Amino acid sequence: VRNGHVLAMASYPTYDPGIWVGGVTPKQYKSLIKSDSLSSNATQGLFAPGSTYKVVSTAAAGEQGYSLYSDYKCPKNIKLGTQVFRNYESAAYGQISLARALEVSCNTVFYGLADRMWESAGGNDATRDSADPIADTAFRFGFGTRTGIDLPGESAGRVAGRGFKVQNWEAKRDTWCENAISGYPDTRKTDPKLADYFTALDKENCADGFRWREGDALNAAIGQGDTVVTPLQMAMAYSAIANGGTVYEPRLIKAVVGSDGTVINRIKPSVKSTLDLPKSTIKFLKDSLPGVTTDGSGKTPFLGFPLNQIPVASKTGSAQVTGDNVSTSWFASYAPANKPRYAIVIMVTQGGTGSQTSGPSVRKIYESLFGINGKNVNPNRSVLVDGEPSKSLPV
C-alpha cells in the first residue's frame, strides 16, 4: 500500500505459458480459448463489487454533509413503489452507527443515504449536470478508469451514475425506439406476454432511459446495478484508504536490467491521483474497517487469528448477478490495520458470500506474509526473506 508494488497476482482458470514455446497447436489454442484462461480476471474481468463498494458510498455521504458518527435506521427492507430493497437475508438491526452499518453490511442504511443524496440532487427532475455524489466519489477511488498497471489489455470498468445513464441511452435509444414500435414480432409468435413486456420496457427506455432514477441510486450505493470493477481496481482503492489517500499506479516491474546485470532503469512509484477527501473521512474508514473483521461480516474466517498483533481491516461483498443463483464473493482488506503494509483482495465468481468463500484464502495469505502459525507471529516463518519485500534485484 506504500508504493503500489504488486507482490502477487493470480487469476483462474490459468495455464502453463510454456505452451507457446515452439508454437501452439490448433487443438491447444482452441482449448485455451474455450477455457477463458487467456484473459486475466484480475485486470480484465469486470464484476459488480457488492458491499465492498460501501466505502465509496460512506465517503460520498460524508462529502454531502451527512454525519459519519450519527445513528441511522437499519430496517430489514425499504419499499419503493412495487419494488422492495432488502438487507442480506432480510436482517434488521434497528438504530445503529454508520461504523456498525459497515461492520454488519446493512444495505438499508446505505439505501437511505443514497435516497437522500438523490433527492438533494434533484431526484427525477435532475439534469445531466446535476450532482452525482456516489459516482463522483467512485472516480476519485480510481473506479471507472484504468489503474495504469504495466500490463496490456487492462479494463477500465464502469461507474453507474447519471453520466453513464445518459451515455447508455444515447447509444441505445434508436434500437429501443425501433423495438418499441415493432413490438418484437418474432417473440410475439411464441410468447405474446413476453413480447408485451419487452415492448413496454423499450417504450419506457426510448422516452426516459436517460433518467437516473431512485432505484438506480439505491442499487449503486451497495455496488449493484451497472457498476463493474476489476479486482485490481478494488485492491488499489483499499490501498488508498490504508495509506491515507494516495492512489498509486500498480507496478509489477521493479527495474530494467541489462544482460550483464547493469540496472538500466529502476522503476519508481507512480502516483495516479489522490482521494481528495477530508482527513476525517479517511480516518473514519480506517477506524471502522477493522471492526468488520473483529465484530462484523468478516469475523468468521479470522476466528483464532492474532488480530491483537496483526489487526486486519476488511469489507466483505456478495454481489448478486442477473440470471445467476449464486453471488460473486468479495473480500477486500489491508493489514496491519494500525500500520498498513499490504492490501489483499480476493474475488470468486459464483462464490456466495465474501466471508465464507474469499475470506479464508485472504487469511492464509496474511499468515504466509507475516509468518503466522495459530496465534504465534514469527517473521522468520514469512514467505518473504526476512519478512520484508526484497529491495534488491535479481542479477
Regions found by a protein language model. Name each.
Residues 1-51, 56-346, 394-395:
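Beta-lactam-recognizing serine transpeptidase/beta-lactamase-like catalytic domain environment
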Residues 98, 234, 354-363:
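Short, charged, low-complexity patches
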Residues 263-270, 361-395:
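Short, gly/Ser/Thr-rich active-site loops of penicillin-recognizing serine hydrolases
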Residues 349-352:
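A generic structural motif
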